[in-house]
Amino acid sequence: MSRGKNSDSGRPKARSVARYTIYNVTEPAELMDFLMRKMAGISRSKVKALLANRVILVDNVITTQYNFALKPGMKVQISKVMNNREFKHPMLKLVYEDAYILVVEKKEGLLSVSTEHQKERTAQHILNEYVKRSHRFNRVFVVHRLDRETSGLMMYAKDEKTQNTLRDNWHDIVTDRRYVSIVSGDMEKDYGTVESWLTDRKLYVYSSPVDNGEGKFAVTHYKTIKRANGYSLVELDLETGRKNQIRVHMLDLGHPVVGDRRYGSECDPLGRLALHAFKLCFYHPVTKELMEFETPYPTAFKGLMQKK
């Protein structure tokens, strides 16, 4: 269940995040040594790269000198927005970028990760091409995935060490990951929990109420926001992150996700799967700062739920 703040509103608004991570100087030090103490695990080459990219400021002045003499009372600021104005793509929006991570909003129809059969029309490939503008050997590292048909927020790492930190500590680092969906029919309950064992057979994920020795335990918490026009608008909170988990659990409840032909939906009024990852909150893998990202519900979702 989410450890972040619960959203009581059915219409969340995008939240802005501070532009800088700020460290207060309490004793004399050189900038390089100061940053290596404050940013656990960072290398000297990484600090030099940050300086070269002109994203480090001392008392609001960009500083590129690694041995800059800091004095008590000064503030060191690290910009958390790097060149995202240069990024434009019809299927992918760059929400946040710093030296370690990228947060993006993916449109439905785009694969998260490159595959043997599809290498270019993927979020991973698009972002690889973007980061190579800074250095030809740069690339992004996969941390988690969204189904091709699902839209919403997701995160990539910019180096292997950050990727490993995120993957190995995912359940401790991520405090809130929430989805919104439109499902068929009127939900019987305002809120509840679905638990089952999910078995992945590649083309289809099977759900079982008991452990058959092959499945992985999955837990989905849901809250019904609105019922209208034979549909229900539902917020979903994942306690586990299994393949197709939400889609299978909504089918288990007898209310398949609208547009999901694979898992029981008989209607497709939006021409897409009605599932969107609208909230992602986590502790930054390096600075340990709490990061909160939230997008509005898709406009098409709101239109379908307007009472006629």
Q: Across the structure, where does each feature detected by a protein language model lie?
A:
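Conserved hydrophobic positions within beta-strands
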Residues: 94, 183, 221-224, 257
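Short, surface-exposed loop/helix-turn segments at secondary-structure junctions
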Residues: 209-210, 258-267
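RNA pseudouridine synthases
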Residues: 1-193, 197-202, 300-304
